[in-house]
């Protein structure tokens, strides 16, 4: 067995699932296939792995965004949203609330008028709960998980029936 020497001063960067990176890409066949030429780690969200529930919710949000084509005009807003959401997943105890708030913000960033169309369809008690979830900081949230789940499901049902956003 022969050891392959590395160039002096080069380090191999192992990228992780939720890492934010700067990439230099290159194509050898007129843009049909792209390869990573260089990568630079910007931020690692390692804390997301501290809990299975957090990992599941963060993965669901990332998959939702990946599944839906983001208009060029809203890409910066969605990138900021993802950055904020991943940081929140890393520090918050309530991943369900982070996901719900992030889903709502994503749909709003895509231009859908949730406040005007979805919100009024909720029963009064759910409107109050939704407003508290969306407007209060995570650290002050006290909503029961069942309430968050119910509101998330109602929002997802609305999105399936009234938008082009792919939930599943």
Residue ranges with predicted function:
Residues 1-168:
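Non-catalytic alpha-helical scaffolds and adjoining flexible linkers that form interface surfaces
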